[in-house]
Design a protein with these regions (language model features):
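Substrate-positioning beta->alpha
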Residues: 1-15
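Residues that recognize and position ribonucleotide moieties
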Residues: 2, 34, 72
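Residue-level signal for the nucleotide or nucleotide-sugar donor/cofactor binding architecture
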Residues: 4-7, 36, 88
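Mid/C-terminal beta-alpha module of Rossmann-like enzyme folds, strongest
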Residues: 12-64, 98, 105, 109-110
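Conserved C-terminal active-site "lid" loop/helix of NAD(P)H-dependent oxidoreductases
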Residues: 63-84
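Conserved C-terminal helix/tail region of periplasmic/extracytoplasmic solute-binding proteins
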Residues: 85-86, 91-109
Length: 110
């Protein structure tokens, strides 16, 4: 899978308002070129944030050798060249999402 964090997409939209830096009427793929496996992200979150462990699925992480060739590759060079390539990782994006959900639940007594 590839990741597009909403903060990165929003930043790209704001940057695109500057017509001197971003050519108009072009399409850009706004995504990290990092390939990731949701099972590995969930396992890392469980390990690094034990207070969330009961909220996250306990899934067997497949060895990298079993994942090779299972993902499509994408070329993000055009978007990276215009907007920069400093995208949030899938791990950071999902960690922020889980934290937001837990915080919302606390505030709303869910």
């Amino acid at each position: 899978m590839v990741n597009s964090d909403t903060d990165d997409v929003a930043r790209s939209h704001v940057l695109s308002l500057d017509r001197t830096k971003v050519p108009g009427n072009d399409r850009y793929l706004i995504a990290s070129s990092e390939l990731f496996d949701l099972r590995a992200v969930a396992a890392k979150l469980r390990k690094e944030t034990p207070e969330w462990a009961s909220r996250l699925p306990e899934i067997e992480v497949l060895p990298a050798s079993r994942l090779q060739g299972k993902f499509a590759t994408i070329d993000t060079a055009k978007g990276d060249g215009v907007f920069g390539a400093d995208w949030k990782s899938a791990y950071e994006s999902l960690k922020e999402t889980v934290a937001d959900v837990i915080e919302w639940e606390k505030k709303n007594a869910v």
